[in-house]
């Protein structure tokens, strides 16, 4: 075969290149230049179509390439050639002019590189449309703070694309590429309005627009030339508000700081110079730890934390905001320490006085303390009372100890409360001073006869010697016998010794003013009373020698007390001097109180809660003619205050309420009932002579001591004589013999009363003598005789002599018995 022609060989090679281009292989021109992208053709759908392709390197497009196009219509042979141009280096562009483009037009395109065909294809303009860019873009300012963009349609009105275009508007900030706006204009009019406040005020903006034909499946046109403007407008109030608020805050802060520093400066230069008592050194009180109460101290955990300086400054600056918080913190801390005392944890809100808080000075803690000091003793009497056992301790005795001072004060208060309680209950106490006891005088009339004997004091040698040296001088009686030696004796009052109110005394006063046993005999009134004798009672002869007193040792404390009181009253009294004994007897104190009250001219004493038996006997003598009642086993001369007869003017006396349960009197033995006979002429001792037999042996000590203890017990003054339930004297007696009046016990206690009336107690209830005629001395024990002052030889003191006025019959054995008139005793309670 021969060689192929060169033209055929080149044609085959081009076909291979086209096939390779369709499969991604570039075609190489004969000059050695490669084509990277084949031509892309677009039409503006008016008169021009544009084709462009990209080369691998810089190429002179007009010298190397030729593009020919031909309308395919009825096999026309009219070919048109387009010379390409260079754009952007390696891009070749060729503009093809076409007349009256319609939708059905189709063109054949061929790309030649010299004589070599590189590419050929058909092109339909209606399917490859690229609209023209809009023209005449302009921006207009509106009165209503809006911007208006206008442009013109690139196509004439008779074109098919005139009514088919849509636009895209781009507004961007010249100084900030990120600040841009995109608006789609889908309506037919080539205009756009947008508010100026959507853009930043004072910034330069530019706008551009491009078109797109959606129906022809076109691409976006090129951007139109841009238009620029400066965006400026007046901002509304809501946009200016943040700036105004920030400026206001800064201004307020500056004002507050200036005020604070101004107040600090004023405080240093003016306020601190004002004199303040709190800064005085005299206010600072140094207190020792021993003088501070334990409950006034705070533990370290309870001490409030110091407020920092910044909080103090803010409190002064803004008191309304911080004062409530401080109060709530303090309340919460107190509630945490003290526990939930007010229910729900709700802090008590208190209004704050701003005017006082802003310029209030810094508080200075001043410790306030209360110190107790002993009062200075003003007179010598108070010092003497303190030295003699007052309840108020002196500073020397206390040793400067604060604890002992408090104990002394507590002792004073306790004594005062106790005395006030006694005064309220009995109606007989009137507290006048601390550490004093209330003693009321039992006697109203100093000259009233007292049917009671006085005996020397037990254990006092002076009393016994004085009793021997100063015997009593009663009138002699021919009918007197040793058993008839009981007589009536007037008990005088003692002179006033204490000048203050006698109704309220202390034991220290009695200590300092207690007298010796001879004090009674030194009193002139007592001497007169010793010389007075009842006219109806004959006196017994005075023995030549004083009988020796028998003083057996008492068995109980009652006997000791009674014996001491009786001996004290019977002892002669020398000149008053300092007492060597301990406390004075209560009866003697009552007697002194009586004289003081009478000397002061006071009325009837209704304040005394308790009376001595001798005072009641004296009161009975003041109302003659009322003692005609027949006594029973439970009746005696002593009565409670509510049982006094209403005939006496001084009858109303408050009833004692404190008895202490010590006034229970044992019942008499059934073999010794009291004698019923008594005289109504005058109260006193009345004899009942039944016989002269004195040789009967005496009774046993137990049988004789009980009646004597019951009879002599009425002579002491203490609060246990009256029943605290019924007001009667506490006695328990058996039924009387011989059809006498029956004494029944009260339903609430064991006291005896006759027909509901308060019973009376006989001070000298002698046991009934046996029918054989045993004398009184025989029925008493030696101890009882010693207490009565009767010797074993049968001699008795003349003060106890008894007249034989009541002798029953000659057939009976005469026996002398000392009896009291049971009539109501009228007495003055002052």
Swiss-Prot record:
<feature type="region of interest" description="Required for IRS1 activation and IL4-induced cell growth">
    <location>
        <begin position="444"/>
        <end position="564"/>
    </location>
</feature>
<feature type="compositionally biased region" description="Pro residues">
    <location>
        <begin position="538"/>
        <end position="551"/>
    </location>
</feature>
<feature type="region of interest" description="Disordered">
    <location>
        <begin position="450"/>
        <end position="488"/>
    </location>
</feature>
<dbReference type="InterPro" id="IPR015319">
    <property type="entry name" value="IL-4_rcpt-alpha_N"/>
</dbReference>
<feature type="glycosylation site" description="N-linked (GlcNAc...) asparagine">
    <location>
        <position position="120"/>
    </location>
</feature>
<keyword id="KW-1015">Disulfide bond</keyword>
<feature type="compositionally biased region" description="Pro residues">
    <location>
        <begin position="646"/>
        <end position="655"/>
    </location>
</feature>
<feature type="modified residue" description="Phosphoserine">
    <location>
        <position position="172"/>
    </location>
</feature>
<dbReference type="GO" id="GO:0009897">
    <property type="term" value="C:external side of plasma membrane"/>
</dbReference>
<feature type="modified residue" description="Phosphotyrosine">
    <location>
        <position position="504"/>
    </location>
</feature>
<feature type="compositionally biased region" description="Acidic residues">
    <location>
        <begin position="378"/>
        <end position="387"/>
    </location>
</feature>
<dbReference type="InterPro" id="IPR013783">
    <property type="entry name" value="Ig-like_fold"/>
</dbReference>
<keyword id="KW-0812">Transmembrane</keyword>
<feature type="modified residue" description="Phosphotyrosine">
    <location>
        <position position="638"/>
    </location>
</feature>
<comment type="function">
    <text>Receptor for both interleukin 4 and interleukin 13. Couples to the JAK1/2/3-STAT6 pathway. The IL4 response is involved in promoting Th2 differentiation. The IL4/IL13 responses are involved in regulating IgE production and, chemokine and mucus production at sites of allergic inflammation. In certain cell types, can signal through activation of insulin receptor substrates, IRS1/IRS2.</text>
</comment>
<feature type="glycosylation site" description="N-linked (GlcNAc...) asparagine">
    <location>
        <position position="217"/>
    </location>
</feature>
<feature type="short sequence motif" description="ITIM motif">
    <location>
        <begin position="716"/>
        <end position="721"/>
    </location>
</feature>
<feature type="region of interest" description="Disordered">
    <location>
        <begin position="378"/>
        <end position="403"/>
    </location>
</feature>
<feature type="compositionally biased region" description="Polar residues">
    <location>
        <begin position="623"/>
        <end position="635"/>
    </location>
</feature>
<dbReference type="Pfam" id="PF09238">
    <property type="entry name" value="IL4Ra_N"/>
</dbReference>
<feature type="glycosylation site" description="N-linked (GlcNAc...) asparagine">
    <location>
        <position position="170"/>
    </location>
</feature>
<feature type="transmembrane region" description="Helical">
    <location>
        <begin position="241"/>
        <end position="264"/>
    </location>
</feature>
<protein>
    <recommendedName>
        <fullName>Interleukin-4 receptor subunit alpha</fullName>
    </recommendedName>
</protein>
<feature type="glycosylation site" description="N-linked (GlcNAc...) asparagine">
    <location>
        <position position="142"/>
    </location>
</feature>
<keyword id="KW-0597">Phosphoprotein</keyword>
<feature type="topological domain" description="Extracellular">
    <location>
        <begin position="33"/>
        <end position="240"/>
    </location>
</feature>
<feature type="region of interest" description="Disordered">
    <location>
        <begin position="623"/>
        <end position="696"/>
    </location>
</feature>
<feature type="modified residue" description="Phosphotyrosine">
    <location>
        <position position="610"/>
    </location>
</feature>
<dbReference type="InterPro" id="IPR036116">
    <property type="entry name" value="FN3_sf"/>
</dbReference>
<keyword id="KW-1133">Transmembrane helix</keyword>
<feature type="domain" description="Fibronectin type-III">
    <location>
        <begin position="133"/>
        <end position="232"/>
    </location>
</feature>
<feature type="compositionally biased region" description="Acidic residues">
    <location>
        <begin position="518"/>
        <end position="534"/>
    </location>
</feature>
<dbReference type="InterPro" id="IPR003531">
    <property type="entry name" value="Hempt_rcpt_S_F1_CS"/>
</dbReference>
<feature type="region of interest" description="Disordered">
    <location>
        <begin position="811"/>
        <end position="830"/>
    </location>
</feature>
<keyword id="KW-0472">Membrane</keyword>
<feature type="compositionally biased region" description="Low complexity">
    <location>
        <begin position="570"/>
        <end position="582"/>
    </location>
</feature>
<dbReference type="GO" id="GO:0019221">
    <property type="term" value="P:cytokine-mediated signaling pathway"/>
</dbReference>
<feature type="disulfide bond">
    <location>
        <begin position="41"/>
        <end position="51"/>
    </location>
</feature>
<feature type="topological domain" description="Cytoplasmic">
    <location>
        <begin position="265"/>
        <end position="830"/>
    </location>
</feature>
<comment type="subunit">
    <text>The functional IL4 receptor is formed by initial binding of IL4 to IL4R. Subsequent recruitment to the complex of the common gamma chain, in immune cells, creates a type I receptor and, in non-immune cells, of IL13RA1 forms a type II receptor. IL4R can also interact with the IL13/IL13RA1 complex to form a similar type II receptor. Interacts with PIK3C3. Interacts with the SH2-containing phosphatases, PTPN6/SHIP1, PTPN11/SHIP2 and INPP5D/SHIP. Interacts with JAK1 through a Box 1-containing region; inhibited by SOCS5. Interacts with SOCS5; inhibits IL4 signaling. Interacts with JAK3.</text>
</comment>
<feature type="modified residue" description="Phosphotyrosine">
    <location>
        <position position="583"/>
    </location>
</feature>
<dbReference type="GO" id="GO:0002532">
    <property type="term" value="P:production of molecular mediator involved in inflammatory response"/>
</dbReference>
């Amino acid at each position: 075969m021969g060689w192929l022609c060169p033209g055929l060989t080149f044609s085959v090679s081009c076909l291979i290149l086209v096939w390779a281009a369709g499969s991604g292989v570039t075609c190489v021109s004969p000059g050695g230049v490669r084509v990277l992208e084949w031509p892309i053709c677009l039409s503006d759908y008016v008169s021009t179509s544009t084709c462009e392709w990209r080369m691998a390197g810089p190429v002179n497009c007009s010298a190397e390439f030729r593009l020919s196009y031909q309308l395919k219509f009825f096999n026309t042979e009219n070919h048109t050639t387009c010379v390409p141009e260079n754009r952007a280096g390696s891009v070749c562009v060729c503009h093809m002019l076409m007349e009256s483009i319609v939708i059905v037009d189709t063109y054949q395109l061929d790309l030649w590189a010299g004589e070599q065909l590189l590419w050929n294809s058909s092109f339909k303009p209606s399917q490859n449309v690229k609209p023209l860019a809009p023209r005449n873009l302009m921006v207009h300012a509106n009165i209503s703070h809006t911007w208006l963009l206008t442009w013109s349609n690139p196509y004439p009105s008779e074109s098919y694309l005139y009514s088919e275009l849509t636009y895209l508007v781009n507004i961007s900030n010249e100084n900030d590429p990120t600040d841009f706006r995109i608006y789609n204009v889908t309506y037919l009019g080539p205009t756009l309005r947008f508010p100026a406040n959507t853009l930043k005020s004072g910034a330069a903006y530019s706008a551009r627009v491009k078109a797109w034909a959606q129906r022809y499946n076109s691409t976006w046109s090129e951007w139109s030339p841009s238009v620029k403007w400066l965006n400026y407008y007046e901002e509304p109030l809501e946009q200016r508000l943040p700036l105004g608020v920030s400026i206001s805050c800064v201004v307020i802060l500056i004002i507050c700081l200036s005020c604070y520093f101004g107040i600090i400066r004023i405080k240093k230069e003016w306020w601190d110079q004002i004199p303040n008592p709190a800064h005085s050194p005299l206010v600072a009180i140094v207190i020792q730890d021993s003088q501070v109460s334990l409950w006034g101290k705070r533990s370290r955990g309870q001490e409030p934390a110091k407020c920092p300086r910044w909080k103090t400054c803010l409190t002064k600056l803004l008191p309304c905001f911080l004062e409530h918080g401080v109060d709530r913190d303090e309340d919460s801390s107190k509630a945490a320490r003290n526990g939930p005392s007010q229910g729900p944890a709700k802090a008590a809100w208190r209004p704050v006085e701003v005017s006082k808080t802003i310029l209030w000075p810094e508080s200075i803690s001043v410790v306030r303390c209360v110190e107790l000091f002993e009062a200075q003793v003003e007179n010598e009497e108070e010092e003497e009372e303190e030295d003699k056992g007052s309840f108020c301790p002196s500073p020397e005795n206390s040793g400067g100890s604060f604890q002992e001072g408090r104990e002394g004060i507590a002792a004073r208060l306790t004594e005062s409360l106790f005395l006030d309680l006694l005064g309220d209950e009995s109606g007989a106490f009137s507290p006048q001073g601390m550490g004093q006891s209330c003693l009321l005088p039992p006697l109203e009339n100093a000259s009233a006869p007292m049917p009671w004997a006085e005996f020397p004091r037990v254990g006092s040698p002076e009393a016994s010697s004085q009793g021997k040296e100063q015997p009593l001088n009663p009138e002699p009686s021919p009918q007197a016998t040793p058993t008839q030696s009981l007589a009536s004796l007037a008990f005088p009052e003692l002179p006033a010794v204490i000048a203050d109110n006698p109704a309220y005394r202390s034991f220290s006063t009695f200590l300092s003013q207690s007298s010796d046993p001879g004090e009674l005999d030194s009193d002139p009134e007592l001497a007169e009373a010793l010389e007075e004798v009842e006219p109806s009672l004959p006196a017994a002869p005075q023995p030549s020698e004083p009988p020796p007193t028998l003083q057996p040792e008492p068995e109980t404390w009652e006997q000791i007390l009674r014996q001491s009181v009786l001996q004290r009253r019977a002892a002669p009294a020398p000149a008053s001097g300092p007492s060597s004994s301990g406390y004075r007897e209560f009866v003697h104190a009552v007697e002194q109180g009586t004289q003081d009250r009478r000397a002061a001219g006071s009325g009837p004493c209704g304040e005394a809660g308790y009376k001595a038996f001798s005072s009641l006997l004296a009161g009975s003598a003041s109302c003659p003619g009322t003692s005609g009642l027949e006594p029973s086993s439970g009746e005696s001369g002593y009565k409670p205050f509510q049982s006094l007869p209403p005939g006496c003017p001084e009858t109303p006396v408050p009833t004692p309420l404190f008895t202490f349960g010590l006034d229970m009197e044992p019942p008499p033995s059934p073999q010794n009932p009291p004698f019923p006979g008594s005289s109504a002429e005058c109260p006193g001792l009345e004899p009942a002579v039944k016989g002269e037999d004195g040789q009967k042996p005496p009774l046993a000590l137990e049988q004789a001591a009980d009646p004597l203890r019951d009879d002599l017990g009425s002579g002491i003054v203490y609060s246990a004589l009256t029943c605290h339930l019924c007001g009667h004297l506490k006695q328990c007696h058996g039924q009387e013999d011989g059809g006498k009046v029956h004494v029944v016990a009260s339903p609430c206690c064991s006291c005896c009363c006759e027909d509901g009336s308060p019973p009376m107690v006989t001070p000298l209830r002698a046991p009934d003598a046996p029918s054989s005629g045993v004398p009184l001395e025989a029925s008493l024990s030696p101890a009882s005789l010693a207490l009565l002052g009767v010797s074993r030889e049968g001699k008795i003191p003349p003060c106890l002599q008894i007249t034989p006025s009541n002798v029953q019959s000659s057939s009976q054995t005469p026996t002398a018995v000392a009896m009291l008139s049971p009539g109501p005793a009228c007495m003055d309670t002052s």
